């Protein structure tokens, strides 16, 4: 994605922003899930919620973005969108 501004903007617009505006812990849940090796149980412990809550939130991520964090290739896209979105947010501030 180096040098591809359109791809970066698309990830921010279609993936990162919808997750942020959902404001029900989706970014936090997705970030924890990805950083904890895609473990539902570890994510639940980290966030002090039930594993079913993590499952529900990850389904909401799929519903909002069209990308399923339970599938490795799609999880990579989501992880990239989180990184690009955070960089874009910090660049604006």
Residue ranges, per PLM feature:
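Cytosolic nucleotide-utilizing catalytic cores of signal-transduction proteins
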Residues: 1-93
């Amino acid at each position: 994605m180096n040098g591809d501004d359109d791809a970066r903007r698309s990830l921010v617009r279609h993936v990162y922003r919808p997750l942020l505006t959902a404001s029900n812990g989706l970014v936090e849940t997705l970030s924890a899930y990805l950083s904890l090796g895609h473990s539902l149980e570890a994510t639940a412990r980290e966030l002090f919620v039930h594993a079913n809550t993590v499952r529900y939130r990850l389904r909401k991520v799929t519903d909002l973005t069209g990308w399923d964090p339970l599938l490795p290739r799609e999880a990579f896209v989501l992880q990239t969108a989180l990184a690009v979105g955070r960089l874009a947010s910090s660049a604006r501030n």
